[in-house]
Amino acid sequence: MKRIAIPFYFLISSLSIQNLQAQNLTEFNKAPLKQQVYVQLPIGSIKAKGWLLKQLEQQRDGATGMAEELYPEKDNLGKNTDWLGGDGNGWERVPYYVKGLVALAYTLDDAGLKAKAQKYIDWTLNNQQPNGLFGPPKMKDWWPRMPMMYALQSYYEATNDKRVIPFLSKYFKYELANLDADPLKEWGKSRAGDNMEIAIWLYNKTGDQDLLKLVEKLKQQAYPWIDIYTNNGFYFYGDDFQPKHMVNVAQALKFPVVYAQLNDLPANRDALLKGIQHIMHDHGQPEGLGSGTEFLAGTSSIEGVETCTVVEWMQSLETAAKVIHQAEIGDQLEKVAFNALPAQFSRDFKNHSYYTLPNQVQSVHGEHGFNQDYGSGIVSSPYSGYGCCRYNMHMGWPYFVKSSVVATPDQGLAVITYGPMEIETLVAGNKKVKITEETNYPFEEQIKLKVGLAAPATFPLILRIPTWSVKPGIKLNGKVLTDVKAGEMFSINREWKNDDQLELNFPMEVATQTQVNNSVSVSRGPIVYALEIKAENKITKTHSVAGFTDYEIRPASAWNYGLSLGKGNLNSVIKVVKSAMTENPFIAVQSPVKLKVQGKKIPSWGLGYNKIAAFDVPFSPVASNEKEEEITLVPYGSENIRLSCFPVIGQPKKVNKSLVENFDKGMAADWVFYGGGWFWKDGEVNSASNAGSGGFGINGSKYVANGTDFKDFTYQADVKINTAGDAGLMFRVSNPAIGPDAYQGYYVGLNQVDGTVQIGKASNQKWMVLSAAKFPVEMNKMYSLKVVARGDKFDIFIDGSAKPVLSVTDGQYQSGSIGLRAYKALASFDSVKINAF
């Protein structure tokens, strides 16, 4: 952290600070907890302005404000929900909703939303059982109580309601006494970090040592998330899907840093960033998240991310920023908030999409083959996909606002993320301060911070300097500060006076990042850009609540473009076009910043086999004979259909001579999986268990080296089948997609069930066996499987056999990629080697 002390003073003017509670509810970590941890300001201390306020107001007037009318059933938010004493079964749905509702209500200071929240809060606080348990009496599950505790935390910080602290104290005593007999399981075992965070918060209020014992017990009963993130162990649990469920993965990102406050070992502090590194390497997407539909789903541009994942990932980073004082945490948080979050919602915040895809060229009903598939999973609707997201999504923007600026133990403030807002709080021995943040960031590079004080006060103000910023600068009352560097937390510790002003300048340059299949995404500052696609909406259902509909979205303009980037300076190739700031910048046609770049259509790239999603982005460079034309890019979050992984126009350069892949260090570069799951362990790549999955794509899962193009060759790999099914090698493959036979090309597999080796081909999503021979395949035995392809003839060898165990002639496919495939089997692969003739 860069620190600078400034001993000079400036003229002041008068300022009146109103509506600030005199009592400071901020409590820092007590011993033996880790010191120097930042703390969230009481909710309501930060007021959104400008475009950020517009997002909250749309929530109020849209999905959040109308949620009880949209979901009036007793098992949802109806008056007979069990969270209001009725006979419904609200489980996690009500607590999810109330968690976001309370945060929105008190961030906006909205009486109507407060009233909606109060009935749930009062019922919960007034109906605690004598033993300390709260919530619906028949609900025997630790998990749903966790999000309700977040709602109570926010409510207490906003109101100082004296009922909350003894209520939570009583509950945690019950929990500590009963966890041995009734240990965490399933979702509670996955999401124990939430429980731990609230217990630590309460410890700092009461000093009750039993709360630290509770944190230890919760840590011991939870999944070993610190090890999972450190060692990329999401798939190491066989049929237990919890550690690879992407919402759990996102939600538990906070687990290591929460526990690090009690046990400040480097392994605990470092696990979050190591986990993110693993996730982004194996499953990363342009908007800053790992894919998950619902399980971790690889890097394909046609895999998606769930709305719950977006808001939980954000909350985890918001928690982490208070413990790990690194600029990259705020960078990552802004990237998700400014791209993924608005992309999940309709422009008016009335609808959401359960999943969104980096390359989502239409939004229509139909099955994709995801691990958890829903016919409405990418459709814009109040009811898109499964029910969890329509309740959990409400915390996204209000939690972002309330976590943007935090209190520091040395009685100062730290700015984690930027946006138009006002902060009113206490610093320097309970002196009132008001900081007005005037900016259109992230659509502009400049941010002004104006300090309001009734009397001078000495305190540190810590500013995050974005890692991506080129030559960032800060002026204090017109004077340039020195030693401002990108990627640092820059501390200004001085005596502040009324009307002091900081001018922050974070220059943004256009940049590209390599994505799946050697494609690129385009960014400027924290904003990722996508192709501007004209959209055509078709209402498919009108709901009883006025103004709420389901609608499909289809493209009304071409989308299959590649970028002509050439070899020149990127900032001369891609032009930045600025216009006036608008009330809601997340509407593509009125975006205040657009990019212009030359591109070409790629006629061979179209919709996939099921006509629901596009084929995955073709491997770059891609040749195109189409004319060059100027195309427009708009912010990722300003559209509900998009193209954000772009092919690059150029002469194709695929590997076609030889390739060796031993999987010594993890998942291979430029290999992509389609359907199911694939993971690395102990020097082998493995197909994952499909337990808990429901999509048609879970069988016949493929792992394809799309950057290869072989015609005649010797191709071999070690193959081990661990459960009943078949597994083997793919070759001369093109257009792989999600689905058992969703590819064009050949496959030779060892079938443990039938005791055969067979070779066949897929065409038009139909599988055709070309030839088969008996071969006793033993479970858990590694076989060396080899294919020799010469023209139309294929010879298959096993374990170095002198003669082919199988031969066949077929001329449909002349060249293509290589890959691995498993059908209904858990299989392991190693020692891939191919040499062209």
Predicted segments, located by residue:
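Aromatic (Trp/Tyr) and acidic
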Residues: 24-111, 145-158, 192-210, 214, ...
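Extracellular carbohydrate-recognition regions
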Residues: 41-51, 654-675
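Extracellular glycan-recognition surfaces and repeat-rich motifs
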Residues: 61-62, 66-68, 666-699
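C-terminal beta-rich recognition modules with glycine/proline-rich loops and embedded aromatic residues
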Residues: 272, 331-339, 344-450, 485, ...
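Secretory/extracellular carbohydrate-interaction modules
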Residues: 695-758
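Short tryptophan-centered beta-strand motifs in secreted/extracellular beta-sheet-rich domains
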Residues: 715-717, 781-790, 794-796
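Short, aromatic/His-centered strand-loop micro-motif at the edge of beta-sheets
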Residues: 763-784
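Short, solvent-exposed beta-strand-to-loop segments that form ligand-recognition rims
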Residues: 797-817
